[in-house]
């Protein structure tokens, strides 16, 4: 699959420090945005299950659903296009501290 993006979109880094089992919004798309990178780091001494979901029109799609070992990181998709109103949510299986960082291209647009 070939994806062409509008290079005029602004990139931003979206950090989230999390230590609760409540689903937490990481990012809400305001237009045709794109996730260019996603990293989850477990800063605790015990493993934790991390779920990252794309929510579109009240339907959730798992992007990451994985146990992250103590003091390690995992990476998500290299490119994830989003529509206006799409939401990225993060949920932890236990209340251990986790850092999540996403790199977003705002207004990436689409072509094709």
Regions found by a protein language model. Name each.
Residues 86-92:
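Cysteine-clustered segments with highest specificity for TGF-beta superfamily mature ligands
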Residues 1-33, 37, 92-112:
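C-terminal interaction-tip segments
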Residues 40-45, 93:
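Short solvent-exposed strand-capping/beta-turn motif centered on an Asx-Ser/Thr pair
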Residues 67-71, 106-107:
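A short, sequence-level motif marking secondary-structure junctions
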Residues 71-85:
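Beta-sandwich interaction modules
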Residues 45-66:
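Short, surface-exposed beta-strand/strand-loop-strand elements in extracellular ectodomains
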């Amino acid at each position: 699959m070939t994806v062409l993006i509008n290079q005029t979109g602004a990139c931003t880094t979206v950090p989230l420090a999390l230590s609760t089992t409540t689903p937490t919004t990481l990012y809400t798309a305001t237009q045709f945005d794109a996730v260019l990178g996603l990293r989850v780091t477990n800063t605790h001494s015990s493993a934790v299950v991390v779920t990252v979901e794309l929510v579109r029109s009240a339907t959730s799609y798992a992007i990451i659903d994985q146990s992250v070992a103590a003091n390690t990181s995992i990476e998500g998709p290299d490119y994830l296009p989003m529509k206006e109103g799409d939401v990225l949510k993060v949920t932890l299986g236990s209340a251990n501290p986790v850092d999540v960082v996403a790199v977003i291209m705002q207004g990436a647009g689409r072509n094709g």
